[in-house]
């Protein structure tokens, strides 16, 4: 194995587990940590108790540091927009890491999020580093719940997202950004019905985390 442990923090057991599974496929040992038990609880915390959520997040980071965890992957787009993680006791690789890399390379995009907080995270980053970027956002919480129920293919078909993707092509947008780590599970289906480049933030998060682990901390 390449590393002792990476902590994968996400909104629900599904996406924290998915992130850990993807890291293990790269021979990186990882342990999932969910901030909520379900998408409904996650959305409620983000909407009604963001301060409480932030306290819980930073308390978890403190505990992980005491366990000598060296790196955290924040595998949830909406959570990353709600909790401030610019100054933390552990290094955090998050969706913002990916946004800062890809947005300056694009003039426009269709952003697909699991809730409005995920869209806000992309919009906020674009405003700061690429203010000329044209972003159209679609939030589909029901698709997230369908994926969590165990049948991503059926959930994707029921969402009628394919028609939205075709509309993005007609509008001349440059790319589709999957700003929900749940959507990594349906990335191939999205790519199959869309001619635009698909930027899967979840997969890129895994790539950045694996690269950071292989590089190791300074002085290793």
Residue ranges and their predicted role:
Residues 1-220:
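Non-catalytic structural scaffold of enzyme domains
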């Amino acid at each position: 194995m390449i590393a002792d442990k990476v902590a994968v923090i996400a909104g629900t057991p599904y996406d924290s587990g998915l992130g850990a599974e993807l890291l293990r496929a790269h021979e990186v040992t990882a342990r999932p940590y969910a901030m909520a038990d379900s998408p409904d609880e996650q959305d409620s915390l983000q909407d009604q108790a963001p301060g409480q959520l932030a306290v819980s997040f930073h308390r978890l980071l403190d505990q992980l540091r005491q366990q000598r965890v060296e790196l955290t992957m924040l595998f949830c787009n909406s959570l990353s927009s709600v909790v401030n993680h610019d100054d933390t006791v552990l290094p955090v690789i998050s969706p913002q890491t990916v946004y800062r890399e890809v947005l300056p390379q694009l003039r426009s995009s269709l952003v697909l999020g699991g809730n409005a907080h995920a869209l806000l995270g992309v919009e906020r980053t674009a405003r700061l580093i690429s203010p000329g970027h044209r972003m159209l956002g679609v939030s589909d919480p029901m698709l997230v719940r369908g994926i969590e129920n165990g049948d991503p293919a059926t959930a994707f078909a029921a969402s009628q997202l394919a028609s939205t993707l075709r509309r993005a092509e007609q509008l001349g947008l440059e790319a589709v950004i999957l700003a929900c780590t749940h959507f990594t599970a349906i990335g191939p289906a999205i790519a199959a019905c869309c001619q635009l480049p698909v930027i899967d933030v979840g997969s890129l998060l895994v790539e950045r985390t694996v690269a950071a682990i292989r590089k190791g901390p300074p002085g290793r």
